[in-house]
Amino acid sequence: MLTQQELKQQAAEAALELVEQVAGPDVIIGVGTGSTADLFIDGLARFKGRLRGTVASSERSAARLAGHGLAVLDLNDVQSMPIYVDGADEIDPNLHMIKGGGGALTREKIVASVARRYICIADESKLVERLGRFPLPVEVIPMARNAVARGLSRLGGQPALREGFVTDNGNIILDVAGLSIADAPGLEKTINDIPGVVTCGLFALAGADVALLATQDGIRRLERRG
């Protein structure tokens, strides 16, 4: 029986096989944030000298990449990337996700938007029929905390401030429990339209293109329909 850590490693290795397919001196790889992304970063070290560089979705990931001797580029200097690789807190069969447990949701969305394909890596426990058991992170401009919290409460959520946490952008996170997420793209737009919200941790309007889910029987690959 593989442990969860071993499953995460398996998912990271599957993504590294995709990097092998696209690697080249002009290639830039987008890299996410979190425990599974950390394993991907560690494996990416073997491509040192075979890539132009990487773009990181957080200061944490940038430091880990640099520690392996991989170039970390400013997104403003990058026009496109073949793939962006990141984990998920939850993912459904439509490849909609909840992300942001590590607090990097805004930069994750931004970096992912520049990649041609979004590759989600996770262990099979993250696959759910409907999103919402994991509290939904929402990045909020500090002065709008209470106003946004009231708006989230009107949507049926129970927002709680993530104590002692500040995002790389200098903002706060509200973690919202109790939401019924039957229409993930619709809810993502509704929450993002609340004044003071930077973005929410729903990745549904632009979800993953491919999910590589590690199971006890190997990698299960899901691809976005249509």
From Swiss-Prot:
Tree of life domain: Bacteria
What is the uppermost EC class here?
A: isomerase
* E.C. numbers: 5.3.1.6
Has keyword Cytoplasm? no
Q: In which pathway does it act?
A: Carbohydrate degradation; pentose phosphate pathway; D-ribose 5-phosphate from D-ribulose 5-phosphate (non-oxidative stage): step 1/1
SUPFAM superfamilies found in the cross-reference section: D-ribose-5-phosphate isomerase (RpiA), lid domain (SSF75445), NagB/RpiA/CoA transferase-like (SSF100950)
Which UniProt keyword terms apply here? Answer: Isomerase
* Role according to the record: Catalyzes the reversible conversion of ribose-5-phosphate to ribulose 5-phosphate.
Please state which protein family the record places this protein in.
Belongs to the ribose 5-phosphate isomerase family.
User: Know the name of this protein?
Assistant: Ribose-5-phosphate isomerase A
Q: To which species is this protein native?
A: Bordetella bronchiseptica (strain ATCC BAA-588 / NCTC 13252 / RB50)
Q: What lineage does the source organism belong to?
A: Bacteria, Pseudomonadati, Pseudomonadota, Betaproteobacteria, Burkholderiales
